From Swiss-Prot:
The modification Phosphoserine is found at S22, S25, S29. It comes from Homo sapiens. One of its GO terms (molecular function) is RNA binding. The modification N-acetylalanine is found at A2. Pfam families: LSM (PF01423). Auxillary component of the N-terminal acetyltransferase C (NatC) complex which catalyzes acetylation of N-terminal methionine residues. N-terminal acetylation protects proteins from ubiquitination and degradation by the N-end rule pathway. The gene is NAA38. Component of the N-terminal acetyltransferase C (NatC) complex, which is composed of NAA35, NAA38 and NAA30. This is N-alpha-acetyltransferase 38, NatC auxiliary subunit. PANTHER family: N-ALPHA-ACETYLTRANSFERASE 38, NATC AUXILIARY SUBUNIT, SMALL NUCLEAR RIBONUCLEOPROTEIN-ASSOCIATED PROTEIN B AND N.
Amino acid sequence: MAGAGPTMLLREENGCCSRRQSSSSAGDSDGEREDSAAERARQQLEALLNKTMRIRMTDGRTLVGCFLCTDRDCNVILGSAQEFLKPSDSFSAGEPRVLGLAMVPGHHIVSIEVQRESLTGPPYL
């Protein structure tokens, strides 16, 4: 994704999609905090829908595509995805392989980057 512009790195804390069951009583504010944190996380994910992402995987491959959805196991679905192989001593990275729709298992994700331009959107006239 050469020349695609600056990116913003997203990092997960304590597991990307973990959700704890809350056994809160009427006077328990911990349940309310968990609900509001879950709501904020959902809103942040919704804001990333249809944005261009670069996902680095444990085997060295990189996938670039449009973020379509995720699930509670942290699997990610990318649309219009392209796969870039990790360059090694025996060969250099060539043309990307077009995958189209791709599911990336959450346990293979090392990092996710979002293209900054796709976050702000193009200027409208």
